Amino acid sequence: MDIQFTEEQELLRNSVQRLLKDEYDFDARRRIVVSEDGWSRTHWKKFADMGLLAAPFAEEFGGFGEGALATMIVMQEFGRRLVVEPFFETVVLAGGLIEAEGTDAQRREHLTGIAAGESIWALAWAEPGARYDLNNVSTTARRSGDHYILSGAKAAVIGAPWADRLIVSARTSGDRRDRQGVSLFIVDRQSAGLHLQSFKTIDGRRAAEITMKDVQVPAAALLGGEGEGAAILEACRDRAIGALCAEAVGAMSELNSATLDYAKTRKQFGVALGTFQVLQHRMVDMFIAHQEAVSLTQHLTLTLASKDSGTTKLASGAKTKVGYAARFIGEQAIQLHGGMGMSDELVVGHYFKRIGAIDIQFGDSAFHLMRFAHTN
């Protein structure tokens, strides 16, 4: 599959490529990752000024109205450069949820802030011991007059240390693993009773364990219908998978390019590595795996853009196949670079860490293979 992009979409891609080529090379990224904040507010402002943070949203909210296609374009280019700024967490996850499920007031208030780069968000859905089960929620939300009172814990919330606001899943009714009874709430990160324990992830980002004790939010902070959060998160997961697959495709492309360049210049036994036929075959296999991942990602993106039902099976199939392809390409790139492939001084090791992190977000390849098998 090969998507024919419109002139506007090509302009978006070219703009992102130029910005990242000029200002987000490997050395610049490394400085950002080891900084105290771990991300660049300067680059975030530039993303906002270029319209990247608004690109997926409808025009009425200052966006381009390009939806999943804009997300794919931006995420693929971000994957090429290992961008750490919270586009995925803020725009794809939170912004996507607010645009899809928010009230008119919530959309007007929050989407414009996201598009302008004025607010950072994170999605707190995973819980200790719950693995990838969206229904496995023990955090509670108790109605008290015009407010809800939230108590519980969330695990490995990516981007939470950077966020101003969180979208939190909590149970308003039912038992821990019931599909019904999960609700979503917009929570200010500075709320009384909410505590973060921050840590660095293997791919250079930031995450946090979150505990909440009697955190009070207004009733208007409910996002979507009460008790309908699990179904909402299922749709969010499919959109998230489309974005993550695009990022992985971008990273795989750079791994292939770096490996090919290395094979052309690194000499062994007096000749370039690339002259050995067995290594040529291996790099062809890497190229084929990447092209298969590109096709599946584009297919999923077009399905998401058309808003057709039944994306669950396709999303899980893509997550599985792209996950396997990314791991294969990453492992081969490391092997062909030798022991130095995993050193911090060489970029391929950083790509390998990122694609490993992508694989476990919203369910790893094994989880989605099982989900694919059990979905009609």
Language model segments and positions:
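Short Gly/Pro-enriched turn/cap motifs at secondary-structure boundaries
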Residues: 87, 129-132, 156-159, 175-176, ...
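Short Ser/Thr-interspersed hydrophobic loop/turn segments at strand-loop and sheet-helix junctions
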Residues: 51, 75-79, 170, 187-191, ...
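Alpha-helical interface subdomain recognition
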Residues: 1-85, 101-106, 113, 117-118, ...
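A short core secondary-structure module
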Residues: 147, 151-195
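Cytochrome P450 C-terminal beta-domain/meander region
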Residues: 133-151
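Flexible, small-/acidic-enriched active-site or ligand-binding loops
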Residues: 132, 136-138, 188-222
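Helix-loop "lid/cap" segments that line or gate small-molecule binding pockets
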Residues: 93-102
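A short, Trp-centered hydrophobic/proline-enriched beta-strand micro-motif
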Residues: 117-128
